[in-house]
Regions:
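Flexible, solvent-exposed loop/hinge segments and secondary-structure transition points
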Residues: 2-231
Length: 231
């Protein structure tokens, strides 16, 4: 005896135009929500970044009690909040309680073991050296790579790291490099952390690259920073 045929579900043909309109609506709504979320969170992100940099600046520039931000664009330095401020490298000048320039802080970044490492470091024009670093962002291996932020022996590298310019003033006299742990012999070398050579090399690379690029221009404009605190 033959089995009765199973009932067939009717196929509903959705017009292509209606489907495209629906997809366009969903895509448009998604894009709007992304933009809205960005606009709502951007001020908070920028404020958190400002606070992090300010805290880091007062750590890496001993004696600094106030700061002013500038934009360095080739041969010119202008206050960052000025209408004439050009695009370029943002620098942070720290001043002591006598309104004297105590040091200059710069941001630097390089690829680490896990992700990009971002730091703030201070340059002291008096000794032409790097006086300290503070990690702003990293995702290095806990207990290994993250030692760059807290290992006392590693941080000693930056008590007076040589950043003098060469005779022409166009670059560093000696490139800042990372060397094997325990083999440091020169003031421009960074004694790496044993077991965290990639993170150590990333710090050396970012300090060297940023200093090579910025310091030749910055040192020619120091007078503008010395006089800014009294304005």
């Amino acid at each position: 005896m033959s089995q009765p045929a199973a009932p067939q579900t009717p196929v509903v043909n959705t017009p292509a135009g209606a489907m495209l309109r629906t997809l366009s609506l969903v895509a448009g709504l998604s894009g709007f929500l992304v933009v809205l979320a960005y606009q709502l969170t951007e001020p908070l992100i920028e404020e958190n970044k400002r606070i992090a940099i300010e805290r880091a600046l007062f750590k890496v520039i001993p004696g600094a009690v106030s700061r002013r931000d500038f934009m360095l664009d080739g041969t010119t330095i202008t206050p960052a909040d000025s209408d004439k401020a050009a695009t370029g490298t943002r620098i942070y000048a720290g001043y002591d309680d006598q309104d004297q320039l105590a040091g200059i802080a710069l941001e630097a970044a390089a690829q680490g073991y896990q992700d990009v490492i971002r730091i703030l470091y201070s340059y002291d024009p008096a000794c032409e050296c790097i006086r300290g670093i503070e990690v702003l962002k990293m995702a290095e291996t806990p207990g290994i790579g993250d030692k760059i932020a807290k290992d006392p022996a590693f941080l000693q590298n930056f008590e007076a790291l040589d950043a003098r310019l060469d005779a022409s003033g166009s670059g560093l006299a000696h490139a800042i490099i990372s060397v094997k742990h325990g083999s440091k012999t020169e003031s421009w070398q960074i004694d790496a952390i044993s077991g965290a050579t990639i993170s150590s090399k990333a710090v050396a690379r970012m300090l060297n690259d940023t200093s090579q690029q910025v310091l030749p221009h910055l040192t020619r404009q120091l007078e503008q920073l010395h006089g800014s605190a009294g304005e």
